[in-house]
Amino acid sequence: VETQPQESPDAAPKPEAQSAEPKSIFDLMTGGSISYEADLAAYYLNEMTAAAAEGDVEAGRSAEEKRNAVIDASAAEPDPGKISFDDLYLLSKVICYEAGSDWLTDEFRICVGEVIMNRVASPEYPDSIHDVIYQKGQYSCVNTARFAGLVPTEECVDAALRLLCGERRMVPSVVFQSNDLQGEPFTMYTDRRLGTTYFCLSENQELYPID
């Protein structure tokens, strides 16, 4: 998979990608804190990711509940933060459906999921992962039998977890992913089997101020 930024000679300068460095698995699990409570929260987060990769919703929700109880009862600094198992599982499934093939890169998987996260944060789209994915006319994969029975791979669960923990590769205004251009492209990926996938910017750049 090759990354090929697209430039239009007459277009206004595009925003630069955010410099969100990939976190280590320890940081993802504990928030960087070293304590009994952080270790326990990390244990339950690991249980959540394992459940997602096995398609075990009941176990995942149970692990989330236990992890939240640990976080609520502790004062670990920094706060490892709560993560919804349903968000993790649903995001993982969409990433797996769109980019689950084993020859695709982790970066591509992150970008696929990042479009969803950008939409959640955008004033142009619904404000939850569920509502973004199930918005009419958007992610049609959710209405298929394949999606209903899909169990995400560990790689896709890992990509979803990193996104939920704040990792980013693009800019907040990248809200389109398609095999056809849907606005000004921020970047694109070319694969001999899948063809070209474009990640495009919203037409309403004024809604996405750059810090």
PLM features: what roles do these ranges have?
Residues E65-D211:
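Bacterial extracytoplasmic/cell-wall-associated proteins, especially those involved in peptidoglycan
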Residues V1-G81:
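N-terminal, intrinsically disordered, polar/charged segments of Gram-positive cell-envelope systems
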